[in-house]
């Protein structure tokens, strides 16, 4: 009898509460204990009993904080506040934003609808990753994106629009860093000079990156060449744009499982970024495997051999004998003089080449248009091309000089033979008269 009386009282209270129009205020007891003891469910069935309706726990779309309360019931609280708090605590441990902050609530709804950003993310912590923003005083922590920072989200997940005044530089070698619109012009002008090779903050170009043994030297006289940071930067820049595999071959790095990653990490320490999976831009030649020091050494030795050992005199004498016709001697001499002048002009042009090589940064002499073409050729040949052509021109000029000397000898011999023949003829005439 006591059990039936208690259950009847419980049913009457439930029916009275349901008839009074309350919005399930009994659920506030969940804040005290989610697993409180319940009375025994032993009661007599009643035909007029209507149990209260509880909505099923299906997933509902999240509402913004400004819409968390219904407009028709401003005086009532959220009946599922405790349940939602428990659900978010287990499902989304990184969501710790309280509901009692109306300022951030309105900001979150505007940012979520306008920029299609995840409302649980906050990019205010990225200002420390951008040196340009911290220096200029323009940080994302003061902008409309400052909500709550989550450091495990990457910068590439951002979807920024032009209306927010923020843009992202997308190049293969330059890391994607958001910059403010005020600094766009200055940074873009600096990046346009060095395409997809240089990152702001590159260390001293004259600093030695590593020492590389030569490929062309004998085992008895092996020499090492110092590779500077500037040379590594030139190998990563156009026109070659070497990848990690080719650059490792140039630097004589042994192949290993993580060799490319180790090389990229070392390059990042000096401010250079070598992306994985990069494709080379130029064809690979034998000169690609040479560092600039060895290429210049090869060009210098080639120039020495051309100047001292090239058979310029023998070649000139042979060709002069091929063209010994007295009627062509004058015209041929004029052609040799004109060719010598043209060759001298071209050699003087190459002597004014100021392409970057090693740790030297000479001042420019030629016009930028001509110098850029010569620099392109020098970068492709790692500094061997220009000195090698000058050495070949030196050998050709020596041939021209020997040819002119041979022409002068022919002229002298021809004029000498003419004088002797005239003298003998005059002597014969005198004897005949006698």
UniProtKB/Swiss-Prot annotation:
<protein>
    <recommendedName>
        <fullName>Transcription factor AP-2-epsilon</fullName>
    </recommendedName>
</protein>
<dbReference type="GO" id="GO:0042127">
    <property type="term" value="P:regulation of cell population proliferation"/>
</dbReference>
<feature type="compositionally biased region" description="Polar residues">
    <location>
        <begin position="81"/>
        <end position="97"/>
    </location>
</feature>
<feature type="compositionally biased region" description="Basic and acidic residues">
    <location>
        <begin position="422"/>
        <end position="434"/>
    </location>
</feature>
<dbReference type="GO" id="GO:0045944">
    <property type="term" value="P:positive regulation of transcription by RNA polymerase II"/>
</dbReference>
<feature type="short sequence motif" description="PPxY motif">
    <location>
        <begin position="53"/>
        <end position="58"/>
    </location>
</feature>
<comment type="subunit">
    <text>Binds DNA as a dimer. Can form homodimers or heterodimers with other AP-2 family members.</text>
</comment>
<keyword id="KW-0805">Transcription regulation</keyword>
<feature type="region of interest" description="H-S-H (helix-span-helix), dimerization">
    <location>
        <begin position="278"/>
        <end position="408"/>
    </location>
</feature>
<dbReference type="Pfam" id="PF03299">
    <property type="entry name" value="TF_AP-2"/>
</dbReference>
<dbReference type="GO" id="GO:0005634">
    <property type="term" value="C:nucleus"/>
</dbReference>
<comment type="similarity">
    <text>Belongs to the AP-2 family.</text>
</comment>
<keyword id="KW-0539">Nucleus</keyword>
<keyword id="KW-0238">DNA-binding</keyword>
<feature type="region of interest" description="Disordered">
    <location>
        <begin position="415"/>
        <end position="434"/>
    </location>
</feature>
<feature type="compositionally biased region" description="Pro residues">
    <location>
        <begin position="52"/>
        <end position="62"/>
    </location>
</feature>
<feature type="region of interest" description="Disordered">
    <location>
        <begin position="30"/>
        <end position="123"/>
    </location>
</feature>
<keyword id="KW-0804">Transcription</keyword>
<comment type="function">
    <text>Sequence-specific DNA-binding protein that interacts with inducible viral and cellular enhancer elements to regulate transcription of selected genes. AP-2 factors bind to the consensus sequence 5'-GCCNNNGGC-3' and activate genes involved in a large spectrum of important biological functions.</text>
</comment>
<keyword id="KW-0010">Activator</keyword>
<dbReference type="GO" id="GO:0001228">
    <property type="term" value="F:DNA-binding transcription activator activity, RNA polymerase II-specific"/>
</dbReference>
<dbReference type="InterPro" id="IPR013854">
    <property type="entry name" value="TF_AP2_C"/>
</dbReference>
<dbReference type="InterPro" id="IPR004979">
    <property type="entry name" value="TF_AP2"/>
</dbReference>
<dbReference type="GO" id="GO:0000977">
    <property type="term" value="F:RNA polymerase II transcription regulatory region sequence-specific DNA binding"/>
</dbReference>
């Amino acid at each position: 009898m006591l059990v039936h009386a208690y259950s009847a009282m419980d049913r009457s209270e439930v029916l009275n509460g349901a008839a009074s129009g309350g919005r399930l205020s009994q659920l506030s007891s969940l804040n005290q204990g989610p697993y409180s003891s319940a009375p025994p469910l032993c009661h007599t069935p009643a035909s007029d009993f209507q149990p209260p309706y509880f909505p099923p726990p299906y997933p509902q779309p999240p509402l913004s904080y400004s819409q968390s309360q219904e407009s028709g019931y401003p005086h009532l609280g959220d009946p599922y506040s405790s349940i939602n708090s428990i659900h978010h605590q287990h499902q989304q441990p990184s969501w710790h934003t309280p509901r009692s902050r109306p300022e951030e609530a309105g900001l979150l709804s505007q940012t979520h609808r306008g920029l299609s950003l995840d409302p649980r993310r906050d990019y205010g912590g990225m200002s420390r990753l951008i040196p340009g923003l911290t220096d200029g005083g323009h940080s994302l922590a003061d902008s409309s994106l400052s909500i709550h920072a989550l450091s495990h989200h990457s910068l590439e997940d951002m979807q920024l629009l032009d209306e927010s005044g923020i843009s992202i530089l997308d190049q293969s070698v330059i890391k994607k860093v958001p910059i403010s619109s005020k600094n766009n012009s200055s940074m873009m002008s600096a990046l346009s000079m060095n395409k997809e090779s240089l990152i702001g903050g590159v260390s001293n170009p004259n600093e030695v990156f590593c020492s590389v043994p030569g490929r062309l030297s004998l085992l008895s006289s092996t020499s090492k060449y110092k590779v500077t940071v500037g040379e590594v930067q030139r190998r990563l820049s156009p026109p070659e744009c070497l990848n990690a595999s080719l650059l490792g071959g140039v630097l004589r790095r042994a192949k290993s499982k993580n060799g490319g990653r180790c090389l990229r990490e070392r390059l990042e320490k000096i401010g250079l970024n070598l992306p994985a999976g990069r494709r080379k831009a130029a064809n690979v030649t034998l000169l690609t495997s040479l560092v600039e020091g060895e290429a210049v050494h090869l060009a210098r030795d080639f120039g020495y051999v051309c100047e001292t050992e090239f058979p310029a005199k023998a070649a000139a004498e042979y060709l002069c004998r091929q063209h010994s016709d007295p009627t062509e001697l004058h015209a041929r001499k004029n052609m040799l003089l004109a060719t010598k002048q043209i060759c001298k002009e071209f050699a003087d042009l190459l002597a004014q080449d100021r392409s970057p090589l090693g740790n030297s940064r000479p001042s420019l002499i030629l016009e930028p248009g001509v110098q850029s073409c010569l620099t392109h050729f020098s970068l492709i040949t790692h500094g061997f091309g220009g000195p090698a052509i000058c050495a070949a021109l030196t050998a050709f000029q020596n041939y021209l000089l020997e040819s002119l000397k041979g022409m002068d000898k022919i002229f002298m011999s021809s004029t000498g033979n003419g004088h002797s023949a005239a003298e003998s003829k005059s002597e014969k005439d005198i004897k005949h008269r006698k």
